[in-house]
């Protein structure tokens, strides 16, 4: 099993737990810093490794009028401030190959969104940064199919990989968590992450925006921790 080194801690299925938490999309700087401060205090009290997560652009939106984020430059500025003030690694996602280099200069982990993880040019561009690359398993792929995604990254010269379970499509506007993915994907030899919040998303479930069933998040998170 691959063990990844990040700042002053390690990431691996047999290593102490790492929490990736922050905001879904970077909003105002005040919101970002308030949330980061809360995470910093809580994870410090619980002695949990923490990586701040925030997206500078949410390109995959239901409506043209939906808020997407502050954009690349402003988003990276916010992430750099969080990283500096709270001494924590940061993760964000990219949507285009051209974003990989700029993001790699600030972020410790680059995330490839679920709908984009089969985009070969994007995967290769991210891999070439040599950063840790987190692949969110698409709602339309089975756990065994993630082997193909991994191989693209490895062929580009990067084996710093994590795989993130985030639910599977179950009819219209509904995701379900197939927790069999948690013992299946480690067989590829890389650390596994569970996104308990996006796993309860209801894509497009509110017409012009997505809904969700947040009341189930704690149960999925506990189940994932129990699996290890």
Where are these predicted regions, by residue range?
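N-terminal amphipathic alpha-helix/helix-capping segment at the start of soluble metabolic enzymes
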Residues: 1-19, 77
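Glycine-rich, proline-tolerant flexible connector loops at the mouths of alpha/beta enzymes
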Residues: 23-32, 50-72
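Alpha-helix-loop-beta-strand connector modules within alpha/beta enzyme cores
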Residues: 37-46, 65-91, 126-132, 182-194, ...
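Structural motif
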Residues: 46, 105-106, 156, 227
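Active-site loop-to-helix "anion-binding N-cap" substructures in soluble metabolic enzymes
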Residues: 78-81, 100, 120, 124-127, ...
